[in-house]
Each structure stands twice: as C-alpha cells, then as structure tokens.
C-alpha cells in the first residue's frame, strides 16, 4: 500500500503536530510540500483535500482528512490505538479531556506568542510585545494547572503516554525557538514531563524536521 501523504509545510506547527502522531504510531507516510507563495493551498487540487484551503491535509488512499487533531487521532487509531486508550472508558475520557485542554488552553495561550515572535517578523511585521506579555500570563496560569496535574501522574491523562501528550510537541518545540522557553523553569514537573517526551525517537525526529536548513 502506498504511504499516506501529509500535505503542508514543516514550518506549520499544525503539520508537525500530525507528524508527531504519525511518527509515534509508526505510520508509513510522506510530507508533500504546499507552495503558499503560489497560493497552491487555494488550488482546486488542494481544495479536494481540504475544502477550507488550509493545511495540513492527509491522504490515505481514497480518504482525505483535514484538521490536525483529527489527523492525529486517525494515525493513532490506525497504527497505535493504545495512544487513545479506547479499551478503557475512564482512561479514554481523560485522554479526550487533555486533548481538549491542549487545544483550548495551552495552545490557545501559546499561539499568539508564536505568531508575534516567529511569524509576524517573517511576514515583514513587528512583534507586538503587549500581546506577547498578555499571553505569557495566560500561559503561566495554564502551566500552574499542568504542574498540579503532573505531580499526580507521569503523563497528562495518567501514568501512560497518550496522544494528549504528543499533541503538545510541535507548539512546545516552537516555544523553544523563542526567547520565552524559560517560562517552563518555574514548573519542575512540567519540565520533567517535557524532558521525557524529548527522549522519544518520534519527538526527536520531528524536532530535527523543524530545524531550519543551514
């Protein structure tokens, strides 16, 4: 069977969120670059993959998927379902909770920081420090909750690695490309959790993928 195709750009933390899940699941896939400069993401061919004209999109045979966290769940269900713990109702529920927390709390606070520090200058803009500072305060409040949670268990959903943990990888790697990575220093259990994730071959591969070429 042909490898799955993941369409997008490695500079997109939504694409590398998918890549992390695909790597951890041991999926056979390839990244197919999309040229934003030529508006390829708005082309008729790409709109078949993602009708919103965005990335990422995943093709697996005749199946097309979009939305990064849905792609991550598909990768887990197909090749490593234990990442979702669907055989245990309570554990699966906690995985779902922390997947939602990642999207609606952690990444919601981190996204504006990453955009202001990493993306805006690339687009010829400037960094709005007020936005950065406001969202750093939001992120600290989120990290307080994470710290409390990780004093009770090794991973977010329990004492087992799950997709909930892996979904944090891409944006946290981006955080370390900013001057604000030290925000984690005040949360020792969060730092230990992150260090453990960084030891995983899947995470190391995605980290290498995200590094700019020399």
Swiss-Prot record:
Signal peptide: none
S-adenosyl-L-methionine recorded as keyword: no
Root EC class: transferase
E.C. designation(s): 2.5.1.18
Gene Ontology terms: biological process: glutathione metabolic process; response to herbicide; response to hydrogen peroxide; response to reactive oxygen species; response to salicylic acid; response to xenobiotic stimulus
Residues engaged in binding glutathione: 12, 41-42, 54-55, 67-68
Name listed for the protein in its UniProt record: Glutathione S-transferase 1
Family recorded in the similarity comment: Belongs to the GST superfamily. Phi family.
Summary of the function given for this chain in its UniProt record: Conjugation of reduced glutathione to a wide number of exogenous and endogenous hydrophobic electrophiles. Involved in the detoxification of certain herbicides.
Single annotated GO MF: glutathione transferase activity
Domain GST N-terminal stretches: 2-83
Subunit: Homodimer or heterodimer of GST-I and GST-IV (=GST-II).
PANTHER family membership: GLUTATHIONE S-TRANSFERASE GSTF2-RELATED (PTHR43900:SF39), GLUTATHIONE S-TRANSFERASE RHO (PTHR43900)
Disulfide bond residue pairs: none
InterPro entries for the chain: Glutathione-S-Trfase_C-like (IPR010987), Glutathione-S-Trfase_C_sf (IPR036282), Glutathione_S-Trfase (IPR040079), Glutathione_S-Trfase_N (IPR004045), GST_C (IPR004046), GST_Phi_C (IPR034347), Thioredoxin-like_sf (IPR036249)
Gene: GST1
Keyword Nucleus: no
Distribution of this protein across tissues and organs: Expressed in the stem and leaves, lower levels are seen in the pollen and endosperm.
Keywords: Transferase
UniProt domain GST C-terminal: residue ranges: 88-214
Superkingdom in the source lineage: Eukaryota
This protein's GO CC annotations: cytoplasm; protein-containing complex
Catalytic activity, as annotated: RX + glutathione = an S-substituted glutathione + a halide anion + H(+)
């Amino acid at each position: 069977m042909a490898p799955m195709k993941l369409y997008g750009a490695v500079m997109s933390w939504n694409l590398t969120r998918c890549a992390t899940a695909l790597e951890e699941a041991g999926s056979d896939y390839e990244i197919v670059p999309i040229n934003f400069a030529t508006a390829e993401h708005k082309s008729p061919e790409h709109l078949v993959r993602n009708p919103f004209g965005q990335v990422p999109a995943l093709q697996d045979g005749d199946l097309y998927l979009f939305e990064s966290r849905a792609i991550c769940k598909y990768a887990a269900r197909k090749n490593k379902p234990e990442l979702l713990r669907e055989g245990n109702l309570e554990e699966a529920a906690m995985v779902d909770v922390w997947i939602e927390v990642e999207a609606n709390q952690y990444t919601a606070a981190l996204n504006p920081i990453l955009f202001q520090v990493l993306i805006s200058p690339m687009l010829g803009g400037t960094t709005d420090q007020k936005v950065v500072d406001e969202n750093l305060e939001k992120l600290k409040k989120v990290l307080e909750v994470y710290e409390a949670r990780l004093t009770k268990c090794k991973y977010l959903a329990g004492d087992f690695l799950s997709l909930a943990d892996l979904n944090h990888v891409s944006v946290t790697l981006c955080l370390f490309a900013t001057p604000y990575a030290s925000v984690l220093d005040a949360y020792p259990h969060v730092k230990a959790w992150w260090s453990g994730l960084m030891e995983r071959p899947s995470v190391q591969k995605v980290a290498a993928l995200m590094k700019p070429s020399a």
